């Protein structure tokens, strides 16, 4: 019985308490639970070619213009704003040495220091791609780039995505 209660607090039900100011579960324990930050078609995957001679350190999702971007996990906003050729960049500290980088949005609606919850709207996509490295693709729609890091090193985000996340576009 106690085991079932502990399991309920660390599973998807733990995300429902919207008054939290700390992650519901440790990021390392969230494998298979995280929603994609925007629905869309995956056009580049971790470890594949980045289109400009390098290796992709995250995933790229083509979305609809104006699509809402949500947080894939609980965390603290440590950066929110323009960065080099990435368009608007959002960096979340997910705890335990994990950071989530989300780039390519047109507008960000959260502030540095803010605690955000899984699924919380944080940004909006523009009408075209904002990420310069994506220009090497044939994508004509906006592209969101998502990268997970552990202790500063990019890691494959694949194991964290929820199995029921489809590659459908929502706007």
Question: Residue locations for each model-derived region?
Answer:
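A short pocket-lining beta-strand/turn micro-motif at the edge of beta-sheets
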Residues: 86-88, 98, 112, 118-121, ...
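Short glycine/proline-centered loop/turn elements that form peptide/ligand docking sites
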Residues: 109-111, 121, 127-132, 136-140
């Amino acid at each position: 019985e106690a085991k079932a209660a502990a399991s309920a607090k660390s599973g998807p039900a733990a995300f429902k308490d919207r008054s939290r100011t700390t992650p519901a579960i440790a990021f390392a324990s969230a494998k298979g639970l995280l929603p994609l930050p925007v629905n869309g078609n995956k056009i580049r995957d971790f470890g594949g070619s980045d289109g400009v001679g390098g290796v992709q350190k995250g995933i790229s999702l083509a979305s609809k213009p104006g699509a809402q971007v949500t947080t894939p996990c609980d965390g603290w906003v440590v950066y929110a704003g323009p960065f080099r050729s990435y368009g608007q960049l959002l960096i979340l500290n997910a705890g335990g040495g994990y950071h989530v980088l989300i780039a390519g949005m047109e507008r960000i609606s959260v502030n540095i220091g803010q605690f955000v919850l899984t699924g919380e709207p944080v940004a909006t996509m523009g009408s075209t791609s904002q990420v310069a490295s994506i220009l090497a693709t044939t994508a004509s729609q906006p592209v969101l780039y998502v990268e997970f890091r552990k202790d500063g090193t990019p890691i494959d985000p694949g194991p964290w995505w929820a199995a029921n996340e489809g590659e459908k576009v929502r706007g």
